[in-house]
UniProtKB/Swiss-Prot annotation:
Role description: Required for the first step of histidine biosynthesis. May allow the feedback regulation of ATP phosphoribosyltransferase activity by histidine.
Primary location recorded for the protein, binned into one broad class: cytoplasm
UniProt miscellaneous comment: This function is generally fulfilled by the C-terminal part of HisG, which is missing in some bacteria such as this one.
Description of how the protein assembles with itself and partners: Heteromultimer composed of HisG and HisZ subunits.
Keyword match Hydrolase: no
Family the UniProt entry places it in: Belongs to the class-II aminoacyl-tRNA synthetase family. HisZ subfamily.
Recorded GO MF terms: histidine-tRNA ligase activity
Domain of life: Bacteria
Organism expressing this protein natively: Burkholderia thailandensis (strain ATCC 700388 / DSM 13276 / CCUG 48851 / CIP 106301 / E264)
Transmembrane domains' residue ranges: none
Record's protein name: ATP phosphoribosyltransferase regulatory subunit
NCBIfam families: hisZ_biosyn_reg, PRK12292.1-1, PRK12421.1
Protein's cellular compartments: Cytoplasm
Keyword Mitochondrion: no
Amino acid sequence: MSTWLLPENIADVLPSEARKIEELRRRLLDRFRSYGYEMVMPPLLEYLESLLTSGGNELRLRTFKLVDQVSGRTLGLRADMTPQVARIDAHLLNRQGVTRLCYAGPVLHTRPRGLHASREQLQIGAEIYGHAGLEADQEIQQLMLDALHLAGLKKIRLDLCHAGVLAALFARDAAAAGRGEALYEALAGKDVPRLNELTDDLGADTRAALRALPRLYGDASVLDEARRQLPALPEIARALDDLAHLASQVKDAEVAIDLADLRGYAYHSGAMFAAYVDGVPNAVAHGGRYDHVGQAYGRARPATGFSLDLREIARISPVEARGAAILAPWKQDDALRAAVGALRDAGEVVIQALPGHDHVLDEFACDRALVERDGAWVVEPR
């Protein structure tokens, strides 16, 4: 086998793509900071049981596992940073009020999520801890939309769902709850034949409600139809009210209701959301409320957040990251070195052409040159 080959669905990031990713990373983290979010940096690997406190079988299957040569215990390479950030909030920071945290780092998946998906993603996201009200959900959704707009994405559609609907149906029907994971997979995949098979022997009300969920998709008026078709349970009524409120607050994106869009249901506990753009079949960002995740670390707190894959966003973003630069000669000249240093201190990119390599570099738009005029080094257009 050739030594330069990489594993399937793993790829190098070349300079032009890396520059674009880094430009977007800085933009998004700066925007998160403008909202008051503090950055944290969890480790890439942890003890497996710490990484798998939530997320169900899906997260377990996506997590790489290895044996720690120091302790002999099983380690995992993180497949999602959300549980790690919840651990930091619950166990390390231990704050009493609202905490806003953000993060950016690689995650690894044992299997790709789609046909062309990478198994190494650069996950970036934000989380709010300590507030159970819809204000936190609204802020997180707005921050996610801001991030996508900063990346230059247009015509964003925000799909809303609520984990409380399915939880309420399971709470009143033990038979349905017993096959919850299979039902979740059928609903998330809109697999109607499989859903019909799984619900054939359930109670009439539960069967009708579960079979209705894939059809409850569309604009906010779908919520009225949901009230007619779903059982009149207080938990379902509250969930639909929450979705109606959140939908009414979105001003800069199309809003759709999809009561079967249950990605990540295993650890979500309230409103869930996903962002889509034209030409991309899968969600470009997703998130939701997960109030119970911190319980495994000794301190459950209200929490909601979102994340996205920065490499995927960079692939579809129209943002141009080919930066302007100044081309300078290479000379043993103290005045030249001082001029180059001053320009770099001022934030300019200055590329000194090594002897015999005076051509313009492809990765930078050298639109200016540092030239000597009357014994002084000055910048001129090229």
